[in-house]
């Protein structure tokens, strides 16, 4: 994984905690199992994506950056998390008459 805030690379496992700005890139592990399972009280959100994306970006602005964002309330970081399918480490090139497929599935 790449931590974009600290500009470091390290392997992480287990639960993620969001107590400050968080911006990390993770390699996609599987198309057949959820890449992310988010729990908030009794609600669970499973997020899967195609391996063709390559990576997932997980982002939360944290309190300091959120206070600077004009389109979010100052405490908005407490109730949001961005998890997006991405292709960060390499480009996707699609030639004429070819196609490329990438998907992300969110399941409650």
Model-identified regions with their sequence ranges:
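Short Pro-Gly-centered flexible turn/kink motifs
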Residues: 93-108
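Active-site/ligand-binding surface loops and adjacent short beta/alpha elements
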Residues: 1-56
């Amino acid at each position: 994984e790449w931590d974009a805030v600290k500009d470091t690379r390290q392997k992480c496992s287990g639960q993620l905690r969001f107590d400050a700005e968080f911006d990390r890139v993770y390699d996609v592990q599987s198309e057949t199992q959820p890449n992310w399972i988010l729990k908030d009280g009794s609600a669970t959100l499973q997020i899967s994506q195609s391996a063709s994306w390559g990576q997932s970006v997980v982002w939360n602005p944290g309190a300091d950056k959120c206070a600077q964002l004009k389109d979010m309330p100052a405490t908005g970081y407490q109730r949001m998390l961005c998890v997006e399918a991405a292709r960060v480490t390499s480009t996707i090139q699609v030639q004429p008459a070819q196609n490329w497929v990438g998907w992300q599935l969110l399941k409650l």
